[in-house]
Amino acid sequence: MRNRFRRLRCILHYTGHLLEVLGLVLLLPLVVVLVYWGRHGESWTTVNAFLISGTVSLCIGFVLRNAFACDDLDTIGSMLTCAVGWLACSAVGALPLVLGLRCSYLDAYFEAISGFTTTGITVFDGLDLMPRSILFWRALTQWLGGLGILSFFLIVTFRASSAHHIFGAESHKISATRPAPGLFNTLKILWQIYAGLTLLATIVLALAKMPVFDAICHALTALSTGGFSPHDASIDFYRATGHAHYRFIEYALTFFMMLGGINFLVHYRVLTRDFKALWDNMEIRYWWGLIVAFTLVVMIDCLRQSGSLTAVFERGTPIAAAEVERTFRYSVFQVMAILTTTGFGTMDIGSAFFGTAAKQLFLVMMVIGGCVGSTSGGFKVLRVAMLNRLMQRELFKAKVSDRASTGLVIDNHIVPDAEIHRVAALFFAWIALLVVGGGITALFSNQETLAAFSGMFSALGNIGPCYISVADMMEMPAVVKITYIIGMLAGRLEILPVLLLFSPRVWR
C-alpha cells in the first residue's frame, strides 16, 4: 500500500513538472495574437484564452510539483506517468479552444488529444475563419507530440533521476541504438534534427509562395506527421484557390511527410554521411518497398476507376501525360499521407476518384504506419516485417521438421522470444481495440460498416482522415468520441500504459 501511495505521489509530482512546462508553451501563441492583432479573428478573447490557460497550467503544475515529493520512479510508475501526463496536457491544452471558440469541453478535449497524439481527426469546421492563434496552437500541439511530450519535457527540464524510466515509456519513438552516449545527448540530437527539418520545410514552403503563417503551420504538422491544416480543404486549398505553385507544394509536402515517417536515427546517420543507412536494415527496405508498391496499386486503380485503362486496352487510346502526372501526384501524396499517418489531403479518400481497391488499401496502410523511431503512428513497419518473418519461419519449420531449430533473425541479430511474444500480443491488442471501437461506432451512430471501422482505424493508428466526414464526426455521440479519445491515446502510447492506467490491480 505504501509503495502505491509513493507511486501516486511521483506521478502527480512529474505531472506537475510537465504542466509547468506546458504553461510556458501556452504563452507562445500570444506572439501570433500580437502579429495579427485586429485581423483574422485576433482580439482580447484570444489573449484571455491563452493567458488564462497558461496561468491555470502553471498554477496546477506548481501545486502538484511542490505538494507531492518524489525521489524516483519504477517502470510501472513511469508508464502511468506517461499516460496521466498525456491526459493532463490534453486537458489543459483544450482550455484555449473552450475559451477562444466557445465550444463544448468534450469537443475541445477531443481536438487537443488529437493534436498531441498527432492523430489529426478534427471535430471543427470553419478553420479558414478561425483566429490564427488557435490554428497555430493546434499545429504546435502536434509538433510537441511528434517526438513525444515527455521527451520534450526531459530536454527542457532534464533530471537524472527517473529520466531513463520516463524516456522508456515513450521508447517506441526511439530504437535502442542511440546516436550519442547519454540520454540527454541523444534527446538533444534528435530534437535538433527535428527542429532543423521543420525549419527547412518552412523555408521550402515559403519559397513556393505559400503564406508564411501557412508554411509554419504545415511544416509543424508535416514533420510531426500530424496533419492539422489551417484550411478546411487541407492541402487541396491551394489548388482550389488557383495557387501558381500548388503542384510543387504537394510534392514538397510528400517529401517532408516521408522524412517524418523514417526513423530519426536514420536521419542522424545520413547527416553524418553514413548514406548506407538508407538501405542497410530490413525496416527501411520494407519502407521503400511499401511506398512503391502502394503508390503503383493506388495509381493503377485510380486510372481504372476513371476509365483510362479501359480506353487503352479496348481502343488503344493513350493516356495523356497530364492525366498520368495528376493521378501519380494524387496517389503518391495520399499514400504518403496515410502510410506516415500524417493525414493531409488533396482529395477526399472516400471520393469516387479512388477505386474500391485503393480504399481497402488505405485501411491496410492505417494499420501499418511508419517506421519505429519516427513521428508516425500505426503498428510500425518493423513489427509488420517481424510478423512476416515469423510466418516464414513457421512455414519453414513445418516443411523441414517440427523440431527444426530456427531463430528469428533480423539484420543479422536473433530476435529474443520475449520480443516476438510482445509484438504478437501488441498485434492482437490492436485487433481487439479495432473490433471494439468499430463496434461501438456502428452501434451508436448511423455509419455503415466500412466507415464505422475506419474511424477507429484512424484513431488507433493516429491517422486523421477516414470515411467519416467532419460534419458526421462533429455529430457523433459522446460515447463514440470518448472511445476515439481512448483509441488515440492507446495508439500513441502503444496500448500498455493505457491498459495499466485502467487496471484496478495497479491502484489497489
Where are these regions (language model features)?
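Membrane-proximal intracellular helices of multi-pass ion channels
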Residues: 1-508
